[in-house]
Every structure is written in C-alpha cells, then in structure tokens.
C-alpha cells in the first residue's frame, strides 16, 4: 500500500515523459556503446583509484548514517521520554525532509562550485560532514527535546549532501552504459559495509 503512489507516478512518467537518449548530454568520447558484463564493469571500476576512494568515502558515510539512524529512536525514547510513535515518526519525518533537502542542496551547490573547480564534487561533501559532526554532538547533548530537534536539523541536512555529488563523480568515471551498474556496485558495497 505504501508504494502505490510511487507506482502511479512511475506509470504517469512512463506515459507522458519521453525517455532521453542515453549519453546525449555527454561529451563525445571514446566510450563504447556496448554494455559491459558485470565482471568487466567490476574490473574497470577496480582499476580506478578515484572509484576506490569514493567507495571508502561512501562506506564511512554509510557507517555514520546507519549508526545514527539505529541509535536515534532509542535515544529519543530514553533521553526525552517520548512515546515510540512520537520518537519514530518524528525522527522519520525530520530525517526524510532534511535528507531530501540535503541531497538537492548538495547536488546544486556542487554543480555551481564545480563549474570553477571540479574538485568541489569531492571536498564539498567532506566539509559538510566535518561541520556536521560537532553540530550533531551539540544537538544530542541538549536536555530539551525542542532545542535538540532544532539543532539536529543542520547536521541532518549536511549529512546527505554527499549523495548527489558522490553519484555524479561515479557516473563521470564510467561510460554511459556502465552508470547503472556503477551505482548498484557503489550502493551495495557501502550499504553492506555500513550495516556490518
């Protein structure tokens, strides 16, 4: 039932929005139009030092994110004596809203700053995480739940800024025919490492 709106939107998009030509906006390069096998994709990605660093960055971000998410509901229950519904729904709504805003903000800022310096796609999320850490500590040490909720907004927003620029880096490392596989591999590695 919860996925029904997404299915409806997907059907509407399929009916009314044309599929863009793959790679139409990419600069013409020596990339092949053939779709590589999974083995070829993994071999290509493993050769890329930039991709390996990206996996490490995504993994550390995943560990931090999964840890905080696993911790927050119990923390809100014990520290502020909220009910389970108040803690889980409140944190879920806040995290969902700040996550969406953080992804959009991170992507937009990286694109803007990246016009002058392509390295912005990497250093912007790194700086955001460095700023977020002490702000998260500040928020979690508040004794008043309202102040905690207000103060946690910024680190929660900053946390997800890595997603847009990070996937952009990954997609720019490979041919258009490898982008979905690259995304899946990056997400699988960082998720598995983050959950372990």
Where are these regions (language model features)?
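Paired intracellular helix-loop junctions of major facilitator superfamily
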Residues: 114-116, 170-179
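Juxtamembrane intracellular "pre-TM" segments in multi-pass secondary transporters
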Residues: 21-55, 79-82
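Alpha-helical transmembrane segments of MFS and MFS-like solute carriers/permeases
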Residues: 43, 52-61, 94, 135, ...
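C-terminal transmembrane helical hairpin of 12-TM major facilitator-type secondary transporters
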Residues: 116-166
């Amino acid at each position: 039932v919860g996925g029904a709106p997404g299915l409806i939107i997907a059907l509407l998009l399929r009916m009314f929005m044309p599929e863009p030509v793959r790679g139409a906006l990419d600069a013409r390069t020596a990339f092949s139009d053939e779709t590589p096998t999974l083995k070829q994709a993994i071999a290509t990605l493993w050769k890329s030092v930039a991709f390996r660093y990206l996996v490490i960055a995504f993994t550390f971000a995943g560990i931090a994110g999964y840890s905080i998410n696993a911790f927050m509901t119990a923390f809100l229950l014990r520290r502020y004596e909220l009910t389970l519904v108040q803690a889980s729904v409140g944190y879920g709504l806040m995290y969902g809203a700040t996550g969406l805003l953080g992804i959009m903000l991170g992507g937009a800022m990286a694109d803007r700053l990246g016009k002058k310096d392509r390295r912005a796609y990497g250093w912007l999320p790194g700086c955001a995480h460095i700023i977020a850490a002490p702000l998260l500590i500040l928020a979690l040490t508040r004794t008043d739940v309202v102040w905690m909720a207000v103060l946690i907004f910024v680190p929660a927003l900053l946390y997800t800024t890595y997603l847009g620029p990070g996937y952009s880096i990954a997609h720019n490392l490979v041919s258009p025919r490898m982008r979905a596989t690259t995304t899946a591999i990056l997400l699988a590695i960082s998720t598995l490492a983050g959950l372990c």
